[in-house]
Amino acid sequence: MDKACKMRYKTMDSPLGKIEISGCAQGLHEIRLHDRKTPDPGPAEAPAPPELLGCPEEMTEPLVQCVAWLDAYFREPSVLPGLPLPAIHHPIFQRGSFTARVLRKLLELVKFGDTVSYQQLAALAGNPKAARAVGGAMRSNPVPILIPCHRVVCSSGAMGNYTGGLATKEWLLAHEGRLAGKPTYPGGSYLAGTRRGALGGTPSPHPAGRDGCVRE
């Protein structure tokens, strides 16, 4: 984080519990799930409009855009392709690391309704043998849901791991119309369209398992 960053925080309700968004005027720093509740696995009514905690005058443009994006994600996903993605200003994206490349490719290419395997994402980031390093990149993701690490699954179709818990990953994929099954990337996206830009180490040599799933 730059010394010049003046941090702002916003909390909103969601079907997954309270979500805290932090960032500065230049972009988002983190999205965190707090007081996580067990998602209802069955069909649910659309959530109520987000309850925002904090003073509106403290909202920077990236925070405003992030709240609008998350609200649309949970309530009306069909409008997502027309929404701008908030800028991201986390230090991880200010380095030319493999992790940064992986997260950028995931954000740019794997859309709502698609899934991608660890091995596919490693190849998209320029190193097809670095599936295990992709797992590490997912654990380092500072802005989950926005950068959709929940869409990264095993090539066998197994769910794989998720920092937010498997119940949350399963709920997010079901919300996007994806149940158990092999990765759909490339193509097959539930929502088409171009998303407008959020993002203005050495990979591990260890392979993934035979089913294409990273072992953490």
Swiss-Prot record:
Kindly list the places in or outside the cell where this protein is found, as annotated in its UniProt entry. Answer: Nucleus
Q: Which family does it belong to?
A: Belongs to the MGMT family.
A GO cellular component annotated for this chain's UniProt record is: nucleoplasm
Any single biological process term in GO? methylation
Q: Where does Zn(2+) bind?
A: 5, 24, 29, 89
Q: Which organism is it from?
A: Canis lupus familiaris (Dog)
TM segments?
none
Q: Which residues carry this modification: Phosphoserine?
A: 14
Name of this chain's protein:
Methylated-DNA--protein-cysteine methyltransferase
The job of this chain, per UniProt, is described as: Involved in the cellular defense against the biological effects of O6-methylguanine (O6-MeG) and O4-methylthymine (O4-MeT) in DNA. Repairs the methylated nucleobase in DNA by stoichiometrically transferring the methyl group to a cysteine residue in the enzyme. This is a suicide reaction: the enzyme is irreversibly inactivated.
Provide the gene name from the record: MGMT
Instruction: Please list the residues that bind DNA.
Output: 99, 118-119, 127, 132, 155
